[in-house]
Amino acid sequence: MSGQVYKRDNGANWNQTSDERLKKNIVDNNIGLAEIKQLRITSFEYRKADEIDMSLFPKANDPLQVIIEGEEGPHTGVIAQEIESVLPECVKTSDKGAKTVQADAITWALVNAVKELSAKNDALEERIKNLEGS
């Protein structure tokens, strides 16, 4: 199975296979607001290729160098090592030790966080309604 990928700005977009018929051991995932609140969003600049130990990356001097060289200026994102301490399942480590973040997994945690906040909001609205009706 494969998805479509294309590069735009500072990322790639994927169509991820999600058909229920391809999955098993399906359980609810409760990662949400508590974990999201621990994540630090950073502003950063990519190092130049000559500032990086390219041996950390499987195919040194290929797309990584092109991506880094083409991504000058400030960026917004996360640090894989920090994400790993909160959501280890969202970080992959190569055999050389380079880390990547699975942003789609964080997206699903955000969905759960929004659902949690919505439930809290609904409960507060109901409480206000009951207090005003007293």
Residue ranges and their predicted role:
Residues 79:
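Phosphate-proximal small/polar/acidic motifs at interfaces that engage nucleotide phosphates
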Residues 45-59:
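Internal, charge-rich low-complexity segments
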Residues 44, 83:
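Active-site-adjacent helical/loop segments in soluble small-molecule enzymes
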Residues 1-25:
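Small/polar residue-rich beta-strand/coil "junction" motifs that cap repeat-based extracellular fibers
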Residues 24-38:
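Periplasmic N-terminal gating module of Gram-negative TonB-dependent outer-membrane receptors
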